[in-house]
């Protein structure tokens, strides 16, 4: 072939080869160019490319090598001599982004010169160097191979025709080299882009292997840049890996910028060689018979199997699965797609680290495109995969909406043939799509998402089984996010009867569902957008305001919910209401707390005797509660109250809000009973600042009065964060709480008051074993998250979870964080606006569920089960021993000076460690190891000034036990990690007698592990039954007595049964399972006797016998199957009996008196032991006995003294330190 013809052929071949890789690009050839032609070509290409990448391919065969300065050679105008072209000039013409290919000997000289230029360049030029890529055929000192085995332009051949080049090179080195004609390689049938042909499958395998090599050896950011952002760049670098492998066999080392690590010996090349050998072995037959059926290579099947093996044994701590890029390629094949998606789903379920790896390999565009398929079998697994992706990377929402992916999930959510757990995942995906993304909100609203969610929130048949709680939760969260700061969607929701539908969920047993419903309702409340307040839309605005007020009425009724998560969402929602209705609430507040009305406030009608069931039903929630305004309206002197309440109806006297709003929030609450002022300051000159979007006119002043009273209640919530939100809401309306009982002095200084908040803004719930934490280990469940399981009431099992307000912010990778900023009760600044709203946390916290493994059980559960089984064995052994023991308690094995200022009020022996917990009236809690005589931990139950302790109780004793601290004002706080020095965490807190102010400060408690019930009562006519599993008040039992309750004891045998001792010395037994509740009444103590100070069911498993002790000193033994008269009486003390303890299993009881004496009795009335003196040389008397408690499984007795603050522990003579 003549030289000019050869030159033209080379150029056309190179053009066609590049065009195969990027057919849409424009290519321009310059054969033997001059300097001016190169410059013009570069400038023209950059002009047309604009900001796109320009490829510059230099074939330097037949011209001198590059100079030491990195100059390449071109011709002058007359083609009489070579002229050097510096790389700096080339770079200045092409600019960036660009990619250079230099196929010539000593090509490394050019790369070296380019790198030196980068070092000399300014920082701005260096910053654009990432957009410049160089591929060079060899290093600076190397010459290209001239062997007949390789073509002259072997580097270019590898970059542009990799399959044929790889097969030729492999054939010369395989066992096929003698039996196969090499020219057949050029006749491989098929098309490169058709995976069902031999050439297409080989190209597919080659792509998968080179991607796998690159992903496993390159940093992930470099892999993304080179292999996932530009199709041509990705193809060139895949082929560059082949060039390195082939040319290194000829002692040439291709180099690149950015520099890649060596890959020519990677073991995945062996997989390529095997695939190539299988192909070449079939090639003669396929060429001889073009109609022969094509048999796919087993490569992808084998790689998927290898990936599956890794899934069975791999973990985050092990090396990542190298097959991940291959799995991605397999998604392109319909025959392997389902299996690949299933395996990919299993991998993503391993945790956020797995999702991050999958995203780094480039999964996103593949699974995005799959949303366009209509294959029914892929729906469940695609929803699962997208759930896992979005649980880590919210930014994917933009591309999902852009490609219409939201419609796919709306259709899935609306399909009844999918499992509820899977539809919950679809709701989660949609919630992420609309989260803070107005385009997503508009798209989903226009697609009817509001109507779909509302339709599935309400069962078609009221008798249908309860919807999966996880689905209810995420339907509410999805609606809330759709309505958030989107007035048009809010209006659609109000017009679609959304409040009435969502309000029905406020009585659901799951706190997560209730909190999510509150979140949705709260986002229906407009925080003050003026868009709907125009003069032409007054009637529409009135309707909107009425709807908002109905929403707020329902929220006010659950402001005393047992779950801090729910109460926190209520507080956030009510703060939104305070902003949107700021003007009118402030005017009502000003009227409420005018100084001249103080005398009237003292005459507020007492609501203390109004009974509160506090068990919310959907109907009562929907009815509203504006009737409360009729109780306080005349006193508040708000003119429209009466008409408003007459129009909207009155609540029943059993409504929980009727007894808690005013009595808790008014100046006559317990905190101000000793003071003439209200403890509330009205900031007359408080500026609205950014709160000028208030409504143009009031609709119902009664609701504003009720709102203020409730927020005063919220501002005293036992959970610090909720209290701080309440104070912030009060400050928004110009009201500030001040300490009504001056902070008590502690250590010479003022003790922090209620305004304090935790040092951490962490918040949320962490279930120890909740309905959404139970994981299914059966993969055949088709990516279902497990459904709710009803409580398994089993002895020694009991409560499975208690809500935790501890929040883990690493759940989502979000730049703005997950936790809400700390709040204080300081006055709001004059420029306050939307940024002062406390953040809702239920959504971000709920997202954490999907970032955890859903398909497999966790090792933590296995460890917990093993620990529980071991503790059950220990407990049974100890029970058997103590039942056979003498129980004489004659040996004092430990004595601990707690240094409590007011003496020891309560003590508790832990069942599986030598630990005793003690507390005083100031609610200081101290933990001590009595075997080692060492302190373990000390902390305060709270930092409020009002103090008083009632009881210490242990929850989940066979698991990671929780410490319940009951305060005498009815507040309950539950702690975990209380035996770790400084590691205690507040799990939950709530008021157990919310609204019963007449109960005073004498609330008594007891806990029933089997049922998960906490019983609370006091100087009141009702006994409140709280389900701590549901975090909900489930029953209010009327005591039918004329006096209050002084002692409570729950049966450890019969769920729902408990005994109560009264101030009038009577005894009653109740059972929540019976219609009448009351099952036994007796007056075993003498007439006009003092109150019952202790009561308990007798040891063992007999549910019919109880023991009651009165302050007069007598102990009565009762059998409920007989008459109400006692069958045994012990005159234990002559008055001043202060404490009674009944062992759970051993046949022994103990009593203690203020006269420094402890007596131990058998169940037959025999006095086993009397303790008067300390076992010391001086023989001092023991202190006045404030509390007694037995070890649950051993013959150990702890006694706390009231005067000398000692806690003494007594045992049998043969006690041995464990």
Curated annotation (Swiss-Prot):
Residues of the signal peptide: none
Residue ranges of WD repeats: 899-938, 945-985, 997-1036, 1040-1080, 1087-1128, 1132-1171, 1180-1218
GO molecular function: protein-macromolecule adaptor activity
Listed GO CC annotations: cytoplasm; TORC1 complex
Database matches in Gene3D superfamilies: Leucine-rich Repeat Variant, YVTN repeat-like/Quinoprotein amine dehydrogenase
Keywords: Developmental protein, Growth regulation, Repeat, WD repeat
Entry's Gene Ontology BP terms: cellular response to amino acid stimulus; cellular response to starvation; positive regulation of cell growth; regulation of autophagy; TOR signaling
Record field: compositional bias (Low complexity): 664-677
Composition-biased stretches (Polar residues): 640-663
Pfam families: Raptor_N, WD40
Region called Disordered, residue ranges: 640-677
Similarity comment: family membership: Belongs to the WD repeat RAPTOR family.
PANTHER family from the UniProt entry: REGULATORY-ASSOCIATED PROTEIN OF MTOR
Function recorded in the entry: Component of TORC1 complex, which is an essential cell growth regulator that controls plant development. Acts by recruiting substrates for TOR. Acts by activating transcription, protein synthesis and ribosome biogenesis, and inhibiting mRNA degradation and autophagy.
Subunit annotation: The target of rapamycin complex 1 (TORC1) is composed of at least RAPTOR, LST8 and TOR.
Protein name: Regulatory-associated protein of TOR 1
Source lineage: Eukaryota, Viridiplantae, Streptophyta, Embryophyta, Tracheophyta
């Amino acid at each position: 072939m003549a030289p000019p013809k050869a030159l033209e052929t080379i150029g056309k071949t190179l053009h066609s080869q590049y065009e195969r890789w990027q057919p849409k690009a424009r290519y321009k050839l310059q054969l033997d160019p001059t300097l001016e032609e190169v410059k013009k070509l570069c400038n023209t290409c950059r002009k047309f490319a604009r900001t796109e990448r320009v490829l510059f391919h230099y074939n330097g065969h037949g011209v001198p090598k590059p100079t030491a300065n990195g100059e390449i050679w071109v011709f002058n105008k007359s083609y009489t001599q070579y002229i050097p072209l510096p790389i700096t000039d080339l770079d200045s013409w092409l600019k960036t982004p660009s990619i250079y290919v230099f196929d010539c000997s000593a090509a490394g000289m050019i790369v070296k010169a380019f790198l030196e230029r980068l070092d000399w360049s300014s920082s701005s030029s260096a910053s654009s160097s990432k957009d410049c890529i160089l591929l060079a055929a060899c290093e600076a000192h190397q010459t290209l191979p001239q062997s007949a085995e390789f073509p002259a332009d072997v580097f270019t051949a590898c970059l542009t025709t990799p399959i044929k080049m790889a097969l030729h090179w492999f054939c010369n080195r395989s066992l096929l080299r003698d039996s196969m004609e090499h020219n057949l390689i050029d006749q491989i049938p098929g098309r490169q882009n058709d995976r069902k042909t031999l050439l297409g499958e080989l190209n597919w395998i080659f792509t998968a292997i080179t991607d796998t090599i690159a992903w496993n050896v390159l940093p992930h950011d470099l892999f993304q840049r080179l292999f996932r952002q530009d199709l041509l760049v990705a193809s060139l670098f895949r082929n560059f890996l082949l060039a390195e492998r082939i040319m290194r066999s000829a002692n040439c080392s291709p180099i690149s910028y950015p520099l890649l690590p060596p890959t020519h010996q990677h073991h995945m090349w062996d997989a390529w060689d095997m695939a190539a050998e299988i192909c070449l072995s079939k090639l003669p037959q396929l060429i001889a018979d073009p109609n022969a059926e094509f048999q796919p290579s087993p490569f992808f099947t084998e790689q998927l199997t290898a990936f599956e093996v890794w899934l069975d044994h791999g973990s985050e701590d092990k090396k990542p699965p190298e097959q991940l890029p291959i799995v991605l390629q397999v998604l392109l094949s319909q025959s392997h797609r389902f299996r690949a998606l299933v395996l990919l789903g299993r991998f993503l379920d391993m945790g956020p680290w797995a999702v991050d790896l999958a995203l780094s390999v480039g999964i996103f565009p593949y699974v995005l495109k799959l949303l366009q398929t209509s294959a029914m079998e892929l729906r469940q697994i695609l929803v699962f995969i997208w759930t896992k992706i979005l649980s880590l990377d919210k930014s994917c929402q933009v591309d999902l909406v852009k490609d219409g992916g939201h419609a796919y999930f709306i259709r899935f959510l609306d399909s009844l043939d999918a499992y509820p757990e899977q539809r919950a995942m679809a709701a989660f995906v949609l919630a992420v799509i609309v989260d803070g993304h107005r385009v997503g909100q508009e798209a989903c609203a226009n697609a009817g998402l509001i109507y779909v969610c509302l339709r599935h929130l309400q069962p078609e048949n009221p008798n249908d089984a309860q919807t999966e709680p996880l689905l209810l939760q995420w339907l509410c969260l999805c609606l809330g996010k759709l309505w958030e700061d989107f007035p048009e969607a809010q209006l659609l929701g109000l017009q679609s009867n959304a409040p009435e539908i969502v309000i029905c969920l406020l009585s659901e047993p799951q706190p997560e569902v209730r909190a999510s419903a509150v979140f949705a309702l709260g986002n229906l409340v407009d925080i003050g957008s003026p868009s709907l307040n125009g003069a032409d839309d007054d009637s529409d605005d009135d309707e909107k305001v009425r709807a908002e007020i109905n929403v707020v009425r329902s929220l006010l009724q659950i402001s005393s919910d047992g779950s801090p998560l729910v109460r926190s969402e209520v507080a956030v929602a009510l703060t939104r209401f305070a902003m949107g209705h700021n003007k009118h609430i402030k005017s009502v507040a000003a009227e409420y707390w005018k100084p001249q009305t103080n005398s009237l406030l003292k005459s507020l009608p007492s609501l203390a005797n109004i009974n509160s069931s506090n068990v919310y039903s959907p109907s009562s929630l929907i009815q509203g509660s504006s009737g409360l305004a009729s109780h306080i309206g005349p006193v508040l002197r708000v003119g429209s109250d009466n008409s408003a309440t007459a129009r909207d109806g009155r609540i029943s006297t059993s409504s929980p809000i009727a007894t808690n709003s005013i009595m808790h929030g008014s100046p006559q609450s317990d905190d101000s009973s000793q003071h003439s002022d209200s403890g509330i300051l009205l900031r007359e000159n408080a500026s609205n600042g950014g709160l000028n979007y208030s409504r143009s006119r009031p609709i119902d002043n009664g609701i504003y009065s009720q709102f203020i009273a409730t927020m005063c209640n919220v501002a005293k919530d036992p959970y610090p964060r909720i209290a701080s939100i309440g104070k912030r809401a009060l400050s928004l309306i110009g009201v500030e709480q001040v300490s009504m009982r001056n902070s008590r002095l502690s250590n010479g200084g003022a003790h922090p008051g209620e305004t304090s908040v935790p040092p951490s803004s962490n918040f949320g719930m962490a279930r120890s074993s909740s309905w959404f934490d139970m994981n299914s280990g059966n993969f055949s469940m088709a990516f279902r998250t497990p459904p709710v399981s009803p409580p398994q009431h089993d002895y020694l099992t009991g409560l499975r979870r208690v809500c935790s307000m501890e929040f883990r912010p690493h759940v989502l990778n979000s730049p703005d964080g997950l936790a809400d900023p700390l709040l204080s009760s300081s006055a709001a600044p004059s420029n306050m606006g939307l940024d002062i709203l406390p953040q809702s946390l239920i959504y971000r916290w709920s997202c954490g569920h999907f970032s955890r493994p859903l398909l497999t059980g966790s090792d933590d559960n296995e460890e917990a089960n093993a620990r529980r089984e071991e503790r059950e064995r220990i407990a049974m052994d100890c029970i058997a021993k103590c039942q056979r023991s003498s129980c004489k308690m004659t040996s004092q094995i430990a004595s601990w000076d707690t240094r409590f200022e007011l003496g020891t009020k309560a003590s508790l022996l832990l069942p599986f460690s030598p630990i005793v917990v003690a507390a005083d009236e100031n609610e200081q809690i101290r933990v001590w190891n009595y075997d080692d005589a060492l302190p373990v931990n000390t902390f305060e139950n709270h930092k409020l000034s009002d103090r008083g302790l009632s009881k210490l109780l242990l929850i989940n004793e066979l698991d990671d036990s929780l410490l319940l601290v009951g305060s005498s004002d009815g507040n309950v706080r539950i702690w975990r990690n209380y035996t770790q020095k400084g590691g205690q965490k507040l799990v939950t807190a709530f008021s157990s007698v919310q609204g019963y102010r007449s109960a005073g400060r004498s609330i008594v408690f007891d806990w029933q592990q089997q049922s998960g019930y906490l019983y609370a009562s006091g100087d009141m006519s009702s006994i409140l039954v709280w389900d701590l599993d549901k975090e909900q008040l489930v029953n209010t039992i009327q005591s039918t007595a004329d006096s209050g309750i002084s002692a409570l004891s729950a049966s450890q045998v019969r769920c729902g049964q408990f005994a109560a001792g009264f101030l009038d010395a009577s005894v009653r037994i109740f059972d929540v399972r019976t219609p009448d509740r009351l099952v036994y009444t007796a007056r075993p103590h003498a007439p006009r006797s003092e109150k019952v100070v202790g009561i308990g069911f007798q040891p063992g498993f007999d549910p019919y016998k109880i023991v009651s002790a009165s302050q007069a000193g007598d102990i009565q033994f009762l059998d409920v199957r007989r008459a109400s008269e006692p069958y045994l009486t012990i005159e234990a003390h002559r008055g001043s009996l202060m404490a009674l303890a009944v062992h759970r299993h051993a046949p022994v009881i103990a009593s203690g008196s203020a006269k420094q004496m402890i007596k131990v009795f058998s169940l037959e009335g025999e006095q086993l032991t009397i303790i008067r003196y300390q076992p010391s040389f001086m023989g001092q008397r023991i202190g006045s006995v404030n509390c007694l408690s037995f070890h649950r499984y051993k013959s150990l007795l702890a006694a706390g003294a009231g005067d000398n603050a000692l806690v003494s522990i007594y045992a049998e003579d043969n006690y041995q330190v464990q």
